Design a protein with these regions (language model features):
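Conserved, well-folded catalytic cores of nucleic-acid-processing
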Residues: 36, 55-59, 74, 89-96, ...
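Conserved C-terminal guanine-recognition region of P-loop GTPase G domains, centered on the G4
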Residues: 57-62, 81-161, 232-235
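Canonical P-loop GTPase G-domain recognition
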Residues: 128-129, 138-196, 200
C-alpha cells in the first residue's frame, strides 16, 4: 500500500499597503512586525515622508508591507507628494490596511467626524479587500470600543475590523492572521533574513531626521531634510558617515546647531546610537547644516529625497 502523502501548506504572499491619517501608528506597527527599527517614529504627525517597504516572512507567508505617509489635506508641494505616494501604493496592493487611531474618537470626536467624507473619499479609491486596524486601544476603556467600531463601519464596508495596540502588541497577532488569510497564493519574493529593501543610507538619513523631530519644535522638523553625502565602510574601523541637514532659513540653522553647537551635538549622539544598532558596528557621524531656501517646493531636491 502507498502511504498517503501529507499535503504541503499553501504559501501566501503579496503586498499590504498601510494607509491612514497621520500619527495613527503605521510605522510603529511595521517596526513591531519586523522586530527592528526601519521606520522612524515620533509623536508629531507627518513624520513619514517616503514609502517604507518592510518584508515580514513566516513559515507559510511573506507580506510586503508598505508603510506610507499619513493621509491629510495637502497644500505645500512636499505634502502633496506625500499624499500621492500613499495613494499610489494602493495600486500595487493585494490588501489595503487602513490604520486608525481609535483613541482619537474619545479625545477629539468632532475632529474625527469632520474627516468622515475625507476618509470615504480615500477608501472609495481602494480596489482590493480593505482591513481596518483600530490602533491604540490600550488608551481606551472597554465600553468605548464598540461605538468606535460602529462609526468606522458606517463609513466603509471593511473586510475585517481588528482592534489592536501596535505599541503594546495587543491584537497584532490577530491582525497578522487576518492579513495572511486574505493574501493570494504566491512565491516567496525575498530571502528570510531580508527585513526591507530600503538601503542603509536611506535608513540612516531617516534616523537622523527622527532625532531632529524629537528635539526641535514648531515648524523646524517640517523644514528639514537629511542628505547622506558619503557612507564609507572600513574593514577594521568604524563606518564613517557624512550628512547634510537642509533647512529653509538661517534662523532654523541657528536653532539646529544650538548654543556652542549643543543641539547639533545632541542630535548626532542620539543618531549614532541608533545607527550603530542598525549596522551592528561602530559608526562615526559628521553633520553639517545648510540653508536651502524653499527646498520643500524644489522638485529636484524632492526627487533626490525620493519623493
Amino acid at each position: 500500500m502507498h502511504q498517503k502523502q501529507t499535503a504541503q501548506p499553501k504559501y501566501h504572499s503579496g503586498v499590504v499597503a498601510v494607509i491612514g491619517p497621520p500619527n495613527a501608528g503605521k510605522s510603529t506597527l511595521l517596526n513591531r512586525y519586523l522586530n527592528q527599527k526601519i521606520a522612524i517614529v515620533t509623536p508629531l504627525p507627518q513624520t513619514t515622508r517616503n514609502r517604507i517597504q518592510g518584508i515580514i516572512t513566516g513559515d507559510d507567508y511573506q507580506i510586503i508591507m508598505l508603510d506610507t505617509p499619513g493621509l491629510h489635506k495637502a497644500k505645500e508641494t512636499i505634502n502633496k507628494e506625500m499624499v500621492r505616494i500613499a495613494l499610489e501604493s494602493l495600486g500595487e496592493a493585494d490588501i489595503a490596511l487602513f490604520l486608525a487611531d481609535a483613541s482619537a474618537m474619545t479625545i477629539a470626536p468632532k475632529k474625527v467626524e469632520r474627516r468622515r467624507n475625507e476618509y470615504q473619499g480615500y477608501l472609495e479609491k481602494v480596489r482590493c479587500p480593505t482591513v481596518l486596524a483600530l490602533n491604540k486601544i490600550d488608551l481606551l476603556e472597554p465600553e468605548q470600543l464598540l461605538p468606535i467600531i460602529d462609526w468606522y463601519s458606517s463609513i466603509h464596508p471593511f473586510t475585517a475590523i481588528v482592534p489592536m495596540s501596535a505599541l503594546e502588541g495587543e491584537g497584532t497577532d490577530i491582525l497578522l492572521k487576518e492579513l495572511v488569510t486574505r493574501l493570494p497564493e504566491g512565491p516567496q519574493y525575498y530571502p528570510d533574513d531580508i527585513p526591507t529593501d530600503s538601503t542603509e543610507r536611506f535608513i540612516v538619513s531617516e534616523l537622523i531626521r527622527e532625532k531632529i523631530f524629537l528635539r526641535t519644535q514648531q515648524e523646524i522638523p517640517y523644514s528639514t531634510a537629511v542628505l547622506i553625502d558619503s557612507f564609507q565602510e572600513n574593514e577594521k574601523g568604524p563606518v564613517v558617515i557624512h550628512a547634510t541637514i537642509l533647512v529653509e532659513r538661517g534662523s532654523q540653522k541657528g536653532i539646529i546647531i544650538g548654543k556652542n553647537g549643543k543641539m547639533l551635538g545632541d542630535i548626532r549622539k542620539a543618531a549614532v546610537r541608533d545607527v550603530e544598532k542598525l549596522l551592528g558596528c561602530k559608526a562615526r557621524l559628521q553633520l553639517w547644516v545648510k540653508v536651502k531656501k524653499n527646498w520643500t517646493a524644489n522638485e529636484q531636491i524632492l526627487r533626490e529625497l525620493g519623493l
